Design a protein with these regions (language model features):
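Bilobed "Venus flytrap"/periplasmic-binding protein-like clamshell domains
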Residues: 54-77, 112, 135-203, 210-212, ...
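Short helix-initiation/N-cap motifs at beta->coil->alpha
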Residues: 86-97, 186-203, 242-244
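N-terminal hydrophobic or amphipathic helices and topogenic motifs
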Residues: 14-94
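C-terminal segment of classical bacterial N-terminal signal peptides
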Residues: 4-13
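Periplasmic-binding protein-like
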Residues: 57-58, 132-141, 228-266, 270
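Ligand-binding "clamshell"
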Residues: 117-129, 223-237
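Hydrophobic residues within well-ordered alpha-helices
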Residues: 99-100, 156, 205-206, 248
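Acidic, polar ligand-binding/catalytic clefts
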Residues: 97-155
């Protein structure tokens, strides 16, 4: 009873201190109305950790990313003057929870989980990847087997269709928002099966375990480059306009100086 009363009192006090938080969790405040969590007004609450923890969205096997990110992590360490540890997260929800609990300081969140990271974990997104010609983003693509009888989206009715995970944009949220206007309603016209990842969805289509799957174009492009499937075995049924890609963000409660150094590291590094 005492703990519950204390928790309620704390929440009430927090609510009284914060006049505006929009869709943010009760842990955070948004007095300036920019839709992301404000830094703590009490400077003693600001963090300046000796070791920074960085994670990247687990759209594919997390193990492949550590080597890919090592050169940037070295650069980040040099610019900030701190040790940097790569944290291989296993799911979108685990990544959001790690940031919310203070175990993560810098992260790349894929499109779907970004609003959850902002609202539930207090992330401040500051950048996405782009190309030198100003292009950015990826597409939701619906794949089926090359010899499939699925020719248009309405043909998905009654089929085995794999979504990736509930929080994924191209793997679940965008299909639920866009497919009804294309003639098919997920969970109504076909039963949704979650494969757990874009690469598992794609490999499942290739193997015939699924009749079709909505996936992120950037993931299947990388899979093809690595020889994980033969593009001749599959066919695109439909693709969307581009969505913003992975957002990079920092924890809201890092010191302003540290946030600036982290951003400097991202913007001064040659990712090409």
């Amino acid at each position: 009873g005492l703990m519950a009363a204390f928790a309620m009192t704390g929440t009430t006090a927090l609510a009284e201190e914060c006049a505006e938080r929009g869709a943010l969790d009760a842990m955070f405040c948004d007095a300036n109305g920019d839709l992301v969590a404000d830094a703590p007004t009490d400077e003693s609450m600001l963090k300046d950790p000796s070791t920074l923890v960085f994670a990247y969205t687990p759209v594919e096997d997390p193990a492949i990313y550590e080597d890919i990110w090592t050169p940037f992590i070295d650069h980040l360490s040099e610019v900030t003057g701190k040790k940097v540890q790569f944290f291989a997260v296993q799911s979108n929800s685990a990544e959001v929870e790690a940031m919310r609990s203070g175990r993560l300081h810098i992260a790349g969140f894929s499109t779907g989980p970004t609003p959850f990271a902002v609202n539930l974990a207090g992330v401040e997104p500051f950048a996405i990847m782009g190309s030198e010609d100003g292009q950015f983003g990826y597409k939701l693509q619906v794949y089926t087997q090359a010899d499939s009888d699925i020719k248009e989206m309405a043909d998905l009715a009654g089929k085995r269709v794999a979504h990736t995970s509930p929080t994924s944009n191209s793997g679940n949220q965008a299909p639920r928002a866009l497919f009804p206007d294309l003639g098919v309603v997920p969970d109504q016209d076909y039963e949704v099966t979650y494969s757990a990842s874009h690469d598992q969805s794609m490999l499942g289509v290739v193997a015939g375990d699924y009749d079709a799957a909505p996936v992120a174009s950037e993931v299947v492009d990388r899979m093809a480059e690595r020889g994980l499937y033969d593009p001749a075995e599959v066919r695109i049924v439909w693709e969307s306009d581009p969505f913003p890609t992975t957002s990079y963000g920092v924890a809201h409660d890092l010191t302003p100086e540290l946030k600036d150094k982290i951003k400097e590291a991202f913007f001064s590094y040659d990712f090409t």
